[in-house]
Amino acid sequence: MPMYILHAKDRPGVLQRRLSFYAAHRAFLEEQDEAGPVRVIMSGPLQTDDGETMTGSLLLLEAPDRAAVDRFVAEDPFTHEKIWGEVSISRFHRRPRPRKDTPER
């Protein structure tokens, strides 16, 4: 199944709103991961360089197609509550990295 990277930057001045809707956003991700069709492989907040402030979100998603990802984004509480500003979605091809302890063939 195709994979997608979702990179979302928060709008300026929304940190307190982000914090108030963070639990709803997390619940949405868990619900979607269980119900499908979009599976959340990895997710987490983007942060300032000092690690003190959340500034956006990064998600690695598995989905049947781009349309499913677009619906996923449209339904996320961070979209409804206008927390995310700029959102980019890119299809991603995972290339396994060989482990150092694996003998070459």
Positions of predicted regions on the chain:
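Conserved, structured core segments of small domains
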Residues: 1-105
